[in-house]
From Swiss-Prot:
Main subcellular location of this protein, as a coarse class: cytoplasm
Presence of keyword Cell inner membrane: no
EC number, as in UniProt: 6.1.1.3
This protein's encoding gene: thrS
Designated name of the protein: Threonine--tRNA ligase
């Protein structure tokens, strides 16, 4: 057989040759250093046979793909270590049943059904066993079995692997990887790829936690235990990640939401349904007020639509039944003699479309920008719900722009300006844009070819004019139009997808939307979907973690706490708090019978931006002693001076304090 090297040179090899044979043919240096290969653009290990005529580029430990290889093998090492862990506890290793063990971002996991529950306390012992397996430098071997042989290996022993074998299409190769010998090693059903031996795995890994995971993500299937690990090429990368992990725990919005009394998810109310507590609602209302001001200034018209709609509305839009799995079931009143069925609103767009369509529209009215803080409902599986970032009911800062094809670029520029204003106001400085365009080889897209080409060109031109750093992702467009979204890094360097802007040719067509053009003829408008925050719940969850609950003054639930030194200043403290409130600040006087230092500490724990201490001197002078969170004591100043500065900081939505 013939394969081709990166420089185009052919290499003759025996039939069934692997990348290992390529390395051997290229000399001792490559044979020693090679860990895998890129074969026709796909990641291979050294063990998988190469196709005839393949283009082969060998990989070493310096290549970024090495990380994928060793993380995958670490998942197998984890499974082997768990089996050995239970063998030493007196269990038959066969009693440990295995689900799947893939590579994930930063590491790996394995889903396991063990004879007794695993806990985080077991992880150091399992991790120690993994390190032993690395030191043994067990070579990996790949082999293929027939369907019957593969089923015989698992049937009656491991229902999860049996199910996976049965799902492999007829005629597709069923491969296994074995590390060590059959008796004391480990063999797993796997497509690969892997490192050549366990000794090639860098020792810079750590098991992080154990969590429950339903088999195949289905809450009606057995609950397995998912053991997570992280792994890196260098000790420095691992150290940095573990620091980030600890910092992320401190910033976890679920923990801070509880401690700062921002929100609540009550099981009696329902899973994934958020109760905003008074302090959390302040953050929500401030964000909405900011967005409302910006939208009105930019020519949006605010509308309100109901939380449910007729099933026919969503059949017309195509949201039902195509997305039925992510929706709550229809609401029926047939037993009351009413034929019409309803659906909890999964999207705001059909409602806005009906507002557009209630009368004839002229080109003079376009672009028409309709905006709403609309609450929608999606059915998320219980196991996938996560604090504010994955919920079943959420509010979107949703808007839909109806415009002519020629106006798409201008509207895109307007939305980009709004999104960038949001990012700047909240201190989100590190971001990049992605433009999703058609895959020219696919025929899944609706709409006119010329309109698509125009929209894609207009989006790229708008992104360039806005000075954005962007990439064009071929095939990332939705079937109904191209899009642009942002990937934003938070304070910990984690990436979040925000601020999607979507061009839509499909819904105007489905609803028969028209406008009368300059020529007196009817034309089809283009529709833009945009939501800079996206879900308010998710956005606030991200902000809580980005700021570590330490919000800038304009978002802080309590902006100032007045602390009297003793009982003698309590009336003055209340007077100061009253004046702050009258001026529009959120202020409280803390007159509890606690030591002054304890009250100051409590305000700091609650992350209140300003603590105003008042004693006899301050009372006599009409002043306050100002402490700014993270900056300490700023000295004494007249109350009027503090009020003027604090109001400026609040009204201008400053990130940094004025004092």
């Amino acid at each position: 057989m013939t394969v081709y090297l990166p420089d185009g040179k052919p290499l003759e090899l025996p039939e069934g040759a692997t990348a290992k044979d390529v390395a051997r043919a290229l000399g001792e240096g490559w044979e020693r250093r090679a860990v895998g290969a890129i074969v026709d653009g796909e990641l291979y290990d050294l063990l998988k046979p190469l196709p005839q005529g393949a283009k082969v580029r060998l990989l070493t430990e310096k290549d970024p793909e090495f990380q994928t290889l060793f993380r995958h093998t670490l998942a197998h090492v984890l499974a082997q270590a768990v089996k050995e862990f239970f063998r030493e506890k007196g269990y038959d290793p066969e009693s440990v049943r295995l689900g799947v063990g893939p590579v994930i971002e930063k590491g790996f996991y394995y889903d396991i059904e063990a004879p007794e529950p695993l806990s985080d306390e077991d992880l150091p012992a399992i991790e120690a066993k993994m390190r032993e397996i690395l030191k043994r430098d067990l070579p990996l071997r790949r082999f293929v079995l027939s369907r019957e042989e593969a089923l015989a290996r698992y049937r009656g022993k491991d229902p999860y692997k049996t199910e996976l074998v049965l799902e492999i299409p007829e005629g597709e190769e069923i491969s296994f990887y074995q590390q060590g010998d059959e008796a004391y090693g480990f063999t797993d059903l796997c497509r690969g790829p892997h490192v050549p031996s366990t000794g090639r795995i860098p020792p810079h890994f750590k098991l992080t936690h154990v969590a429950g995971a339903y088999w195949r993500g289905d809450e009606n299937r057995p609950m397995l235990q998912r053991v997570y690990g992280v792994a890196f090429r260098t000790a420095e990368e691992l150290k940095e990640y573990l620091w980030q992990l600890e910092e992320a725990k401190k910033r976890d919005h679920r923990r801070l939401g509880r401690e700062l009394e921002l929100f609540l998810i009550d099981p009696l109310v329902g899973k994934g349904l958020v109760l905003w507590l008074p302090k959390g609602n302040v953050v929500r209302e401030e964000l909405m007020a900011f967005m409302r001001e910006e939208q009105v200034r930019r020519g949006y018209q605010l509308v309100t639509t109901p939380h449910i709609g007729s099933l026919e509305l969503y059949k017309t839009s195509g949201h039902y039944p195509y997305y039925a799995e992510s929706q709550f079931p229809p609401i029926s009143f047939k037993e009351r003699g009413e034929e019409e069925e309803y659906l909890l609103k999964p999207m705001n767009c059909p409602h806005h479309i009906r507002i557009y369509a209630y009368r004839k529209r002229s080109y003079r009215e376009l672009p028409l920008r309709l905006a709403e803080f609309g609450t929608v409902y999606r059915y998320e599986k219980a196991g996938e719900l996560l604090g504010l970032t994955r919920v079943r009911g959420f509010t979107q800062d949703d808007a839909h722009i109806f415009c002519t094809p020629e106006e798409v670029k201008g509207e895109f520029l307007g939305v980009l300006d709004l999104v960038l204003k949001v990012f700047a106001t909240l201190g989100l400085k590190d971001y990049r844009a992605r433009i999703g365009v058609r895959d020219p080889k696919s025929d899944k897209y609706v709409g006119d070819e010329a309109k698509w080409a125009l929209a894609e060109r207009q989006i790229e031109e708008a992104a360039a004019e806005a000075g954005l750093r962007y990439t064009v992702e071929e095939g990332d467009a939705a079937f109904y139009g191209p899009k642009l979204d942002f990937v934003v890094k938070d304070a910990l360097g984690r990436e979040w997808q925000l601020g999607t802007i979507q061009v839509d040719y499909n819904l105007p067509e489905r609803f028969g939307l028209t406008y009368v053009g300059k020529d007196g003829e009817e034309h089809r408008p283009v529709m833009l979907h945009r939501a800079p925050f996206g879900s308010l719940e998710r956005f606030i969850g991200i902000l809580i973690e980005h700021f570590a609950g330490d919000f800038p003054l304009w978002l802080a639930p309590v902006q100032a706490v007045v602390v009297p030194v003793s009982e003698k200043q309590e009336d003055y403290a209340r007077e100061v708090a009253g004046r702050l409130k009258e001026a529009g600040l959120r202020a409280e006087a803390d007159t509890r019978p606690e030591r002054m230092q304890a009250r100051i500490r409590d305000a700091e724990v609650q992350k209140v931006p300003y603590i105003l201490v008042v004693g006899e001197r301050e009372k006599a002078e009409g002043a306050v002693s100002v402490r700014r969170r993270k900056k300490g004591n700023l000295g004494t100043m007249p109350l009027a001076a503090f009020l003027e500065g604090a109001l400026r900081e609040y009204r201008e939505r400053r990130l940094e304090p004025v004092f």
